[in-house]
UniProtKB/Swiss-Prot annotation:
NCBIfam families: 7-cyano-7-deazaguanine synthase QueC (TIGR00364), PRK11106.1 (NF008317). This is 7-cyano-7-deazaguanine synthase. Its EC number is 6.3.4.20. Catalyzes the ATP-dependent conversion of 7-carboxy-7-deazaguanine (CDG) to 7-cyano-7-deazaguanine (preQ(0)). PANTHER family: 7-CYANO-7-DEAZAGUANINE SYNTHASE. It comes from the Bacteria. HAMAP family: QueC. Zn(2+) binds at C188, C197, C200, C203.
Length: 231
């Protein structure tokens, strides 16, 4: 039996990954992390979506220690989430230092226990928003370290790594979940489901990707299939 663990936030990217994993694995587990995030509403959204999409199990892990250590606008209400700035340089204040290091490591430990062969994460280098822990180089390095540390071959899969946001919408559509991802996921840094606040970087990226996909469906779908190897 093929098993996988999805690092699951209930947002566009991880929900698309879950939809695909349900077709590619016999048994899919979801792991969601409560780190005291500003957009904590995503946890309830993740619970509902994991159930709706047929996850075998859904764990919500308390990692609020991260909130104490990692200062970010996503972990401190006193730090405002910035509006989208197209020419912003450097690492944004929405970056939570160590988040993906912790999430992927804990997901791998869970995968070890349930005998899963893969941990799936929706990180993406094409639209990585300046986050260093969304890069392919980082994921591969951590995967190597985790496998050495557990003497176990658990594969970190990044199905969105080389596709852009429009192509991520195409992937959701390919698996028949475009409307669900559009209406029921929570990507917004301010914790608003669906189309979100419309001002933060996450909402801007999501909306621009959707608009591009809807206006160029055939071309974007073809590009997504070419990059992912889907037929």
């Amino acid at each position: 039996m093929k098993r996988a663990v999805v690092v699951f936030s209930g947002g566009q990217d991880s929900t698309t990954c879950l939809a695909q994993a349900r077709h590619q694995y016999d048994e899919v587990h979801c792991v969601t992390f409560d780190y005291g995030q500003r957009h904590r509403a995503e946890i309830d959204v993740a619970r509902a979506l994991a159930l709706k999409l047929g996850a075998r199990a859904h764990k919500v892990l308390d990692v609020t220690l991260l909130n104490e250590l990692a200062v970010s606008s996503l972990t401190r209400d006193s730090i405002p989430v910035p509006d989208y700035e197209p020419n912003a340089d450097g690492i944004p204040n929405t970056f939570v230092p160590g988040r993906n290091i912790l999430f992927l490591t804990l997901a791998a430990i869970y995968a070890y226990q349930v005998k899963a062969e893969a941990v799936i994460t929706g990180v993406c280098e094409t639209d990585f928003s300046g986050y260093p822990d969304c890069r392919d180089e980082f994921v591969k390095a951590l995967n190597h370290a985790v496998n050495l540390g557990m003497a176990k071959d658990i594969r970190f899969e990044t199905p969105l790594m080389w596709i852009d946001k429009a192509e991520t919408w195409a992937l959701a559509d390919y698996w028949g979940q475009l409307d669900l991802v559009r209406e029921e996921t929570l990507t917004c840094y301010n914790g608003i489901k669906g189309d979100g606040c419309g001002h933060c970087a996450a909402c801007n990226l999501r909306a621009n990707g959707l608009n591009h996909y809807l206006s160029n469906k055939a071309a974007v779908m073809a590009a997504m299939k070419q990059k992912t190897g889907l037929r």
